[in-house]
Amino acid sequence: MKTLGEFIVEKQHEFSQATGELTALLSAIKLGAKIIHRDINKAGLVDILGASCAENVQGEVQQKLDLFANEKLKAALKARDIVAGIASEEEDEIVVFEGCEHAKYVVLMDPLDGSSNIDVNVSVGTIFSIYRRVTPVGTPVTEEDFLQPGNKQVAAGYVVYGSSTMLIYTTGCGVHAFTYDPSLGVFCLCQERMRFPEKGKTYSINEGNYIKFPNGVKKYIKFCQEEDSSTSRPYTSRYIGSLVADFHRNLLKGGIYLYPSTASHPQGKLRLLYECNPMAFLAEQAGGKASDGKERILDIIPESLHQRRSFFVGNRHMVDDVERFIREYPDA
């Protein structure tokens, strides 16, 4: 049995110029995930379920667990002295870590994706993304360090808190999965070099918003529902409402996750930096594809910290089909 710590160190030795800083950073995220796992499992007993009295920069009411997870991850990262600053879905601005100007990495994160589901015991997750800063080491980080395209990511991953807690990550050399053993307090390797199945048969989208979708997406949904034995259609519809949980299922079983623009969210709803980029990096490393319907997600130049985007991610052939329908059936 190989632990996450052992696996990370083993991979570090494959790079002659590795300094160990990224290893320490991933270990800090691992610690934060353990703390969140522990408290999610007793959330109903310690009054951290439900909404708080605060709103985030998008005007959304923050869940108590959102704020809790944000603070725990922030503390775990700051304590290691190897991160210059963070950007979080739960923070209005970047958070600069004083005394860490020498650090060369920054972290972007969604501390608890799908947190509105926690009250009903549905899987939730943590998403993280790591970049090398672009401003000089030795100076405080600025917003410029965080507004980098996804193709500049050094590492990305997510933790899914479900029937078991799993951590999945990539450093650009494949996607690897680890399952948390609470009796030992360690994440153990359960799958190395994960890949999307060759064919996907599941589509994940909130069809309750169908009337608000672009024409191309409506046509694609109908395509998924049509019978065609040559393409194994109709596809199965599965939607949890937690990006991490939906993506994880599709990664294992094959499928596509769709969150298009709507009349109320013309730019899309998911955050480019905290959700789309890390999941796109993972998808491509697992042989999949991620797009906003027209453009590769990882090539998009971000303009603001909380920028939103349409998001289609999963099996390559399924994302290709969505892009084709969007091209062929543009909105009037």
Swiss-Prot record:
Enzyme Commission no: 3.1.3.11
Catalytically driven reaction(s): beta-D-fructose 1,6-bisphosphate + H2O = beta-D-fructose 6-phosphate + phosphate
Q: How is the cofactor bound?
A: Binds 2 magnesium ions per subunit.
Q: What CDD domains is this protein classified in?
A: FBPase
Gene Ontology molecular functions: fructose 1,6-bisphosphate 1-phosphatase activity; magnesium ion binding
Q: Which residues does the annotation say bind Mg(2+) 2?
A: 110, 113, 275
Entry keyword annotation includes Transit peptide: no
- Indicate the segments annotated as coiled coil, or none if absent: none
Gene Ontology biological process: fructose 1,6-bisphosphate metabolic process; fructose 6-phosphate metabolic process; fructose metabolic process; gluconeogenesis; sucrose biosynthetic process
Give the subcellular location.
Cytoplasm
Pathway note: Carbohydrate biosynthesis; gluconeogenesis
Q: What InterPro entries does the record tag this protein with?
A: FBPase_C_dom, FBPase_class-1, FBPase_N, FBPtase, Fructose_bisphosphatase_AS
- Spell out the HAMAP family in the cross-references: FBPase_class1
- What family name appears in the similarity comment? Belongs to the FBPase class 1 family.
Provide the assembly information.
Homotetramer.
**NCBIfam families xref list:** PRK09293.1-1 (NF006778), PRK09293.1-3 (NF006779)
Name of protein: Fructose-1,6-bisphosphatase class 1
The species this protein was found in: Salmonella typhi
Q: What is the lineage of its organism?
A: Bacteria, Pseudomonadati, Pseudomonadota, Gammaproteobacteria, Enterobacterales
Q: Which gene encodes it?
A: fbp
